């Protein structure tokens, strides 16, 4: 695995986590 791919994978993971948190906040009406 090249370092560049590792960084992309980590970025994807962070993005997914942020999207999940935003979705949960949106459903709860918390902004």
From Swiss-Prot:
PTM annotation: The post-translational modifications that lead to mycofactocin involve oxidative decarboxylation of the C-terminal tyrosine residue catalyzed by MftC, introduction of a tyramine-valine cross-link, removal of the modified C-terminal dipeptide by MftE. The released dipeptide then undergoes oxidative deamination by MftD, glycosylation by MftF and methylation by an unknown enzyme.
A Pfam match: MftA
InterPro entries: MftA
Site label Cleavage, positions: 29-30
Recorded phenotype for the gene knockout or disruption: Cells lacking this gene lose the ability to utilize ethanol as the sole growth substrate.
Role of this protein: Precursor peptide that leads to mycofactocin (MFT) after extensive post-translational modifications by enzymes encoded by adjacent genes. Mycofactocin acts as a redox cofactor of nicotinamide-dependent oxidoreductases encoded in the same locus. Is required for the in vivo ethanol assimilation in M.smegmatis.
Additional record remark: Mycofactocin is classified as a ribosomally synthesized and post-translationally modified peptide (RiPP).
Family to which this protein belongs: Belongs to the mycofactocin precursor peptide family.
Name the UniProt record assigns to this protein: Mycofactocin precursor peptide
Organism annotation: Mycolicibacterium smegmatis (strain ATCC 700084 / mc(2)155)
């Amino acid at each position: 695995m090249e370092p560049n791919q590792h960084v992309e994978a980590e970025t994807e993971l962070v993005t997914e986590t942020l999207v999940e948190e935003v979705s949960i906040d949106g459903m709860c009406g918390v902004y």
